[in-house]
């Protein structure tokens, strides 16, 4: 905890093509080693693929996909008298968004055998349709929270 008061979150400027902060955050999650232009090509290429396949606005598809993947609950370890309990807590909106984007990108990277823009597009479409690796990760987290519901009173 900082002694100089609360830390204010940085303002992320929207991306130039879709004028969306969400797309900019996705670009930042895809980026490796500071190579932003490559990350932009991947994300914009994926958005073009989504537009071709769904005939819908890719931004609304992405927003719905992220909304589907965003977890509501997570478990945090809490030490009580020598035992460590996994305590379920609600996920704040900023952390939920961050986790959703991270899981979508990770699931896209785990797919093999095609270019990254195609993998990312397919993962976003899967998340849009409530299937895929990122949705599996969210369901796994919700199952953990459900299994440890008995420890919910240890919340802090």
Curated annotation (Swiss-Prot):
GO molecular function: mRNA binding; rRNA binding; structural constituent of ribosome; tRNA binding
Pfam families in the cross-refs: Ribosomal_S7
SUPFAM superfamilies hit by this protein: Ribosomal protein S7
GO terms under biological process: ribosomal small subunit assembly; translation
InterPro entries on file: Ribosomal_uS7, Ribosomal_uS7_bac/org-type, Ribosomal_uS7_CS, Ribosomal_uS7_dom, Ribosomal_uS7_dom_sf
Gene3D superfamilies, sorted: Ribosomal protein S7 domain
Superkingdom of origin organism: Bacteria
GO cellular component: cytosolic small ribosomal subunit; ribosome
Keywords: Ribonucleoprotein, Ribosomal protein, RNA-binding, rRNA-binding, tRNA-binding
HAMAP family reported for this sequence: Ribosomal_uS7_B (MF_00480_B)
Assembly information from the UniProt record: Part of the 30S ribosomal subunit. Contacts proteins S9 and S11.
Recorded family membership: Belongs to the universal ribosomal protein uS7 family.
Function statement: One of the primary rRNA binding proteins, it binds directly to 16S rRNA where it nucleates assembly of the head domain of the 30S subunit. Is located at the subunit interface close to the decoding center, probably blocks exit of the E-site tRNA.
The name this protein goes by in its record: Small ribosomal subunit protein uS7
Organism from which the protein derives: Dictyoglomus turgidum (strain DSM 6724 / Z-1310)
Gene from which this protein is expressed: rpsG
């Amino acid at each position: 905890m900082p002694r100089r008061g609360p830390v204010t979150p940085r303002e992320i400027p929207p991306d130039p093509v879709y004028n969306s902060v969400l797309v900019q955050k996705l670009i930042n999650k895809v980026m490796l080693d500071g190579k932003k232009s490559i990350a932009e090509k991947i994300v914009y290429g994926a958005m073009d693929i989504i537009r071709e396949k769904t005939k819908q606005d890719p931004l609304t598809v992405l927003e719905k996909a992220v909304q589907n993947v965003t977890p509501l609950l997570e478990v945090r370890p809490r030490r009580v008298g020598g035992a460590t309990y996994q305590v379920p807590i609600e996920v704040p909106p900023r952390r939920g968004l961050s986790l959703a984007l991270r899981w979508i990108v990770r699931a896209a990277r785990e797919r093999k055998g095609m270019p990254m823009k195609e993998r990312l597009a397919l993962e976003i479409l899967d998340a849009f349709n409530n299937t895929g690796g990122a949705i599996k990760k969210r369901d796994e987290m919700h199952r953990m929270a459900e299994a440890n519901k008995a420890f919910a009173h240890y919340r802090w």
